[in-house]
Amino acid sequence: MFSRVLIANRGEIAVRVERTLRRLGIESVAVYSDADAGAPHVRAADRAEWIGATPAAQSYLDVEKVIAAAERAGAEAIHPGYGFLSESPELAHACAAAGIVFVGPGPEAMALLGDKVAAKDAAAAAGVPILPGLSGESLTDEEITAWAAGAELPIVLKAAAGGGGKGMRVVSDLVGLPDALVATRREAQGAFGDDRLLAERYLANGARHIEVQVLADSHGNAVHLGERECSLQRRHQKVVEESPSPVVDAELRERMGAAAVALLQSCGYVSAGTVELIAEREDPSAFFFLEVNTRLQVEHPVTEAVTGLDLVELQLRIAAGEELGFGQDEVRMEGHAVEARLYAEDAAHGFLPSTGRVASYREPAGAVGGPGGGEAIRVDSGIEQGSEVGLDYDPMLAKLIAHGPDRRAALAGLRAGLADLVVLGPATNAAYLRALLAWPEVREGAIDTGLIERLGAEVSPPPAAPVLAAVAFSVLLGPPPSDDPWDARDGWRASGPAWARARLAGPEGEVEVAIRAAPAAPPRERSHFCPDTDEKCEREDWDWEIGEDSGTFSFDGQTLAVDGEARELSIYGDGDAVWLLDGAAEPARFEVVEAVGPEGGVAGGGSLEAPMPGVVIDVRAEAGGEVAEGDVLVVLESMKMELSIQSPRDGVVAEVLVAVGEQIARGQNLIALAEPSTEEGTG
């Protein structure tokens, strides 16, 4: 076995490989670009090597830099992870030339199976069913057009060198074929440096994407580890995967597995590999070859969960020349596992990528990293609080995997894990995934590759409730200091609580909010909020108004009650903003744009109060001076804005209770006002 291995990747897969290396007592070497200096995968490694600037072409995709880093670190092997150079024959050749072991198949098998035309021919030769279509070394547009004219529509165009959903176009009519050919060739050239295409029948009435995990060693041993159902996709990319498939029985599993093993053995394949199949939705026994992934798959954890095996460990042992050590009859699949991919994307707007700093990150309670966690939620993550999510790399942030005794339990566990997950900052698809997993077709296993597209916005999580803006404002106002109503910082006064008003920016745009401590709730029953802690907080009751909406809510930092209905609500501070999470909707971030003073009136005893916490930056009143209604008496800096406190009536300043520079709390007395003198001079 190796003593030191370099991981030619980043993010969650690098962290996941590092876990296995650590368990095996193997030193790990991370690589990083400028953007990833200090990233979790770098800190988790025993050693790290810088390989270039942020763009992947200048770092993670640069074979020479990766090899040089391995040589500097004295690494005996390179594990490529997935993506980047994981299916690069060039890297495999370079490793061989440098005397470094590539943890994966040989370059010849990789090149053969990485070419869709050659792979399809190999599949047919090995007896794997293939879809009717047209393939050749260099098909012209004219050849494809002529074939399509006599084919059953729709058809799909695919990049011969492609994979991962890139370089694909579905063509439903011949009129759109010329434009589709141009666009697909352009995308194929840009993504793979190769514009060759193939064309084949497209299963228009819905298809299942089912793949088989295979392991093959250099001693002629090969086994399959069952199948994974990967039909829940958007833009031809997987979102949710599971094992086993809800529609594959033991007989079909053996047929699919035998076909996959036969194909890889016929190509001299050694390592972990995945044979992807496409099947009829209603009759999965009618399956066809799709492609081969010559690397570890993103969704490998579901196979690890049901088999109890560590696929990274097996990859390493095979690469070190060891035998598998078990046969097909020893492979056992226990229970059911489901994985959800957490993407930095806006599900409500076409799954567009999202960027930003991760303001807060919390994994589900009891989560484990890597295989071997039993039925606990497994999280493979490459982010943490403070991570910057940009557009330079894949938007996948993490994966959540749930394992249960059956499919129903696994789905329920995954939904619970997603509800307990906190990722604030860039938009993510977490709430969307929860809604998707609860959808009837998904619960019943009646899924296909077109389901997400057909559902569209139907499955979108609900928008944030209007009252959340009022709750956020109450949190931003800060806590009252004591049980003394005369010292309360909540706007309470003998004549009734005052309204605090502000304009907040939230997920639905800007909104004007007014709140006041509910008159029915004495101040002594209210306490402080506890954002970012697990402490139990006491209840606060508030009246609220937003446009034509109004009501009363109660909140204790964990449970929000509105009109008698209670739900869990979490608070996370983010500088001068606050995040609210209710488990169903997307996280909602609120920030005060403009603070507005309270309605007229003075506190008990004739004191003018602060509507918000802040710092006194100007005092314009003097003791004994007369003031008129509307005169500015004190100026506060609150929430990065200036707030002028005006006299609510004519009067005389009895006492100035604050000074410039003083930090004051919400509801604190600022100026004591007396009635204006009514005595007339005697002359």
Protein language model features and the residues they cover:
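Catalytic cores of soluble metabolic enzymes centered on carboxylation/carboxyl-transfer
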Residues: 260, 301-549, 632, 662, ...
